[in-house]
Curated annotation (Swiss-Prot):
This is T cell receptor beta variable 7-8. Alpha-beta TR is a heterodimer composed of an alpha and beta chain; disulfide-linked. The alpha-beta TR is associated with the transmembrane signaling CD3 coreceptor proteins to form the TR-CD3 (TcR or TCR). The assembly of alpha-beta TR heterodimers with CD3 occurs in the endoplasmic reticulum where a single alpha-beta TR heterodimer associates with one CD3D-CD3E heterodimer, one CD3G-CD3E heterodimer and one CD247 homodimer forming a stable octameric structure. CD3D-CD3E and CD3G-CD3E heterodimers preferentially associate with TR alpha and TR beta chains, respectively. GO terms for biological process: adaptive immune response; cell surface receptor signaling pathway. InterPro entries: Ig-like_dom, Ig-like_dom_sf, Ig-like_fold, Ig_V-set, TCR_beta_variable. The keyword Cytoplasm does not apply. It is found in: Cell membrane. Residues 22-115 form the Ig-like domain. Disulfide bonds join 42-111. V region of the variable domain of T cell receptor (TR) beta chain that participates in the antigen recognition. Alpha-beta T cell receptors are antigen specific receptors which are essential to the immune response and are present on the cell surface of T lymphocytes. Recognize peptide-major histocompatibility (MH) (pMH) complexes that are displayed by antigen presenting cells (APC), a prerequisite for efficient T cell adaptive immunity against pathogens. It comes from Homo sapiens (Human). PROSITE patterns: IG_LIKE. GO terms for cellular component: plasma membrane; T cell receptor complex. Gene3D superfamilies: Immunoglobulins. CDD domains: IgV_TCR_beta (cd05899).
Length: 115
């Protein structure tokens, strides 16, 4: 059987502040082989202290993964397994890491920020 590819579509909630700048995520799209490690980056709106990650499977609504207040990860109850990790070491940019990707990880990953 050939190697299966997973398609990762990364979009952001486009919140805006007085400058019109919004949440930025990269990469915008990611295709990974099963078993590959993936890192997704979220740049929140400047000045926002709260940051949220969500996962949206095909045909489903967004589901909560984790929540940060500055650099502190206050709730990670939604992270689905020990292969998912999130960090925000400087209280600004956050990274969601998925190790050893599996077919069921294929989803839209959303990041949002707030004051």
């Amino acid at each position: 059987m050939g190697t299966r590819l997973l398609c990762w579509v990364v979009l952001g909630f486009l919140g805006t502040d007085h400058t019109g700048a919004g949440v930025s995520q990269s990469p915008r799209y990611k295709v990974a082989k099963r078993g590959q490690d993936v890192a997704l980056r979220c740049d929140p709106i400047s000045g926002h202290v709260s940051l949220f990650w969500y996962q949206q499977a095909l045909g489903q609504g967004p589901e909560f993964l984790t929540y940060f207040q500055n650099e502190a990860q206050l709730d990670k109850s939604g992270l689905p397994s020990d292969r998912f990790f999130a960090e925000r070491p400087e209280g600004s940019v956050s990274t969601l890491k998925i190790q050893r990707t599996q077919q069921e990880d294929s989803a839209v990953y959303l990041c949002a920020s707030s004051l």
